[in-house]
Regions:
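Secretory targeting and sorting signals
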Residues: 1-41
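Small/flexible residues
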Residues: 9-12, 65, 96
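Beta-propeller-forming repeat regions
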Residues: 44-64, 73, 80-85, 97, ...
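An N-terminal, helix-rich hydrophobic module
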Residues: 74-77, 91
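Short beta-strand elements bearing conserved aromatic residues within extracellular beta-rich modules
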Residues: 89-92, 576
Length: 637
């Protein structure tokens, strides 16, 4: 049976249609906020049903207006919201002066030539010929970037090992319900360790900042949470539907919340002589986004049990954690935390409702009938409505777990690093999963049907293939392209070689004005071309994270129009520097964060070996066909 199409409850709206309807009465109105618009939603319920009956809960965001200075003037960009009337047009104002003789009905950007770099802009939606209240003033990227000042923690020493702090992975969420994103940032001590390495580490700290650099709170995870890429995976999302995001992560005895309250036993130290934490209680805590206050704490599932049951006896594989956010009931977000992937793998899903954590289900590869799922996890995970039933699945490397916590499929290709899930082959129904493997007895790279796990093609064998990317980086080949470290060439949707391999296999970013994605690696952005890539951005005074992984603190559509921002730490760790595109576009696309597959990808991006986000639709091919992006079906708190 062919897999079902996945574009459920979405409406494609062309730019031409939007332009035709923008100024007339009787335009189709979808519930949504916008600036000056209203929307309501039923409160979150934990009740389940056979099929989702309503729209997905999504953030009520403002326009996110930015002004990016460049040699040709200021590029003003803003969000087209998923709750907007698709025909919404916009007026643009500079310091209160109207710049647009007629409301703009196309892409949500406007170039203001020869304007002062510090000019302030607002935009006002026009719906049915009526101008709505103006947006909040623009954020100014005078030289192409915006610095968010940081309060760098003091370093210290532990067991003879001195350390300072580097700003590491980040996430975003509307922590206070004002429609604007705040940043949640993890600070790693410089003596952080891979699980395979012994040694004591300094404590992991987690901060929250407004975009003007105001620190809202600091959480100290304490001595019993080791520092390293595989230990702390934090999720930032509005789980209870109150309009403000929560922050969830693994905690332990001695964790101190944002108000100074200690979780568990403040004096306990469970570290052994090698710095590993292989005894003592383990917790999952949900913190209030606005204050960092611990709202509820539960025992982490699963517990470590017998350390050797996870693949070794010294503490490496037992502490391999992943985390994500998924709409398991099709309407409301749940959190997912896991343990293990080399051998035993356990995934626990949780709801946070009415101030309490409730375990939704646990999937354990040790349970009867689940043995094939052992050893299939990657150093990352993804979340998508893989089978088209309106509810999300957990894409766990070379396997998938259904929304109800039962196994959906397993390829048997084993453990790997990079995992990508999206609509990579638009001429076939549904989503695809691209993986690259470390298992030398399995294919180096493979593409599978996300609904069934049926493998569409494989490439190479016998190698530990550490890097791989899937994305539409070249318009000369239909659908996405695929490449990886140990496989030659750039591969097309059918696996055949279509061009030379790009110079990096890391992150992706929509940066210039077309629908193809650019290459993001280290502190630079390049545009792929078979005849040679073109450098579009060199980040100045910034540094990437996670050693040779060379990842940004965060990358995604967090401000302005649908193009993606890149957030790097400054080299001296005094600020996060946000870059936003200076390039115009003629593509009208709703903000990607109102596509829930993309939005939850921003939530899990910080997990272990960070990977770029993918939406649920093929942006490049819909643009090439002259169609607008599919319109989200969402509701707001």
């Amino acid at each position: 049976m062919p897999p079902p199409a996945h574009r459920r409850r979405r409406t494609a709206v062309t730019v031409a249609t939007a332009a035709a309807l923008a100024l007339g009465a009787g335009a189709l109105t979808l519930p949504g906020p916008g600036d000056g618009a209203t929307a309501t939603a039923a409160p979150v319920s934990s009740a389940s049903s056979d099929a989702p009956s309503g729209a997905r809960l999504a953030e009520r965001l403002d326009r996110g207006v930015v002004s990016v200075g460049g040699p040709d003037g200021n590029l003003v960009t803003w969000r087209l919201l998923g709750g907007d009337d698709p025909a919404t047009a916009f007026n643009v104002y500079r310091d209160g002066e109207l710049l647009t003789p007629e409301p703009l009905t196309g892409a949500t950007n406007h170039l203001d030539p020869d304007a002062p770099a510090d000019a302030s802009y607002t935009v006002a939606a026009v719906v049915g010929g009526q101008e709505q209240p103006p947006s909040a003033p623009s954020l100014t990227f005078a030289d192409g970037s915006l610095d968010v000042p940081l309060d760098r923690p003091e370093g210290g020493s532990v067991n003879g090992s001195a350390y300072t702090y580097d700003a590491n992975d980040a996430s975003v969420g509307d922590l206070d319900g004002d429609g604007r994103y705040e940043i949640v940032l993890k600070w790693d001590p410089t003596n952080a360790r891979d699980n395979s390495q012994s040694g004591h580490t300094g404590p992991v700290l987690v901060d929250a900042y407004t975009l003007d650099g105001t620190r809202l709170w600091r959480i100290d995870l304490g001595a019993n949470i080791r520092a390293g890429a595989h230990y702390t995976q934090f999720q930032v999302y509005d789980y209870d539907g109150d309009g403000s995001a929560e922050v969830a992560m693994k905690t332990a005895d001695g964790t101190r919340d944002g108000e100074g309250t200690v979780i568990g036993d403040a004096g306990a130290d469970h570290r052994n002589s090698g710095g590993y934490v292989l005894s003592g209680p383990e917790y999952l805590t949900v913190f209030e986004g606005a204050t960092g206050r611990a709202l509820d704490t539960a025992d982490y599932a699963p517990g470590r049990g017998n350390v050797a049951d996870w693949g070794d006896g010294y503490g490496n594989r037992v502490d391999r954690f992943l985390a994500g956010t998924a709409y398991l009931d099709g309407e409301n977000p749940s959190m997912v935390f896991s343990r293990g992937y080399y051998t035993r793998a356990v995934i626990a899903a949780w709801d946070f409702r009415d101030g309490e954590l409730t375990r939704r289900w646990v999937f354990d590869s040790d349970d009867p009938g689940n043995g094939a799922y052992a050893g299939q996890g990657f150093h990352s995970l993804s979340v998508a409505d893989a089978d088209g039933d309106g509810r999300d699945e957990v894409m766990f490397g070379a396997a998938a777990v259904d929304d109800d916590g039962t196994g959906l499929w397993v390829t048997g290709h084993g453990h790997g690093d990079a995992l990508h899930v999206g609509d990579f082959v638009p001429d076939r129904p549904g989503l695809e999963v691209y993986g690259v493997g470390e298992n030398t007895a399995s294919p180096d790279a493979w593409l599978a049907d996300a609904a069934t796990g049926d493998v569409l093609w494989t490439l190479g064998s016998g190698n530990d293939n550490g890097r791989g990317v899937a994305g539409d980086v070249w318009a000369g080949s239909p659908g996405a392209e695929f490449w990886s470290s140990s496989v030659s060439g750039l591969r097309g949707a059918d696996g055949d070689e279509v061009g030379p391999k790009p110079g990096s296999a890391n992150f992706l970013v929509w940066w210039d004005g077309d629908a193809s994605r650019e290459l993001l690696d280290g502190t630079r952005i390049d545009e792929y071309d078979p005849d040679g890539s073109t450098r579009l951005l060199d980040g100045e005074g910034v540094a990437s994270n996670n050693g040779t992984k060379a990842t940004p603190a965060l990358s995604g559509d967090i401000l302005g129009d649908w193009r993606e921002e890149v957030v790097w730490r400054t080299a001296d760790n005094t600020a996060l520097r946000i870059y936003s595109t200076p390039h115009e576009t003629d593509l009208r696309v709703p903000t990607l964060v109102h596509d829930t597959q993309y939005r939850v990808a921003l939530a899990w991006q910080n997990t272990a070996y960070n990977q770029p986000p993918h939406p649920s639709f093929a942006l490049g091919d819909t643009a090439a066909e002259g169609a607008g992006a599919p319109w989200p079906d969402i509701r707001h708190p």
